[in-house]
Amino acid sequence: MKAAGGLVDRDGGLRATSLDALARLNPVVPGGAHTAGTSSQISDGAAAVLLADADRARALGLRPRAKIVAQCLIGAEPYYHLDGPGAATERVLAASGMTLADIDLFEVNEAFASIVLSWLAVHRADPDRVNVNGGAIALGHPVGSTGARLLTSALHELERRDASTALITMCAGGAMATATIIERL
């Protein structure tokens, strides 16, 4: 990718650090827990996901790889807005008639490390099925293409494992959150 400073050929995060350096970081708000060390870096990214009716895709010679089983967008209590992915998970499971046991993989976006930890505490999902290739702290948080990145990561991993279903959830800003369940075809 070309940028003003030349060619960008490597990821800008993660930087070298230590536990001592992380412990010295100030929280975002006085008395808070979130610091730059517990947050994902905002990274450059671009993505495209083609959504189409299955018949139209086939008419165009395209092979559908997955279908959307259910999805939702919810508003969370603004003071507790980081709980949104948990509430969205409950809503999308109810809409689909599925349970956590029906889901093979989970992608839970983590703008802050506490989001996925809270989600795990609430839902008690198997941590070995959550963000199996790393979450936003490891991979970056490409604002504007995070949903596409999560969905694509989930679909590729379903194909690698020959698994069937994934649940993707993330904060959507302004105390909103979304969740989607996909089924590999």
Predicted segments with their positions:
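N-terminal extracellular/periplasmic Venus flytrap/periplasmic-binding protein-like
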Residues: 1-59, 122-129
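Short glycine/threonine-rich loop-to-helix capping motif typified by GTGT followed
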Residues: 7-13, 78-85, 110-128, 142-146, ...
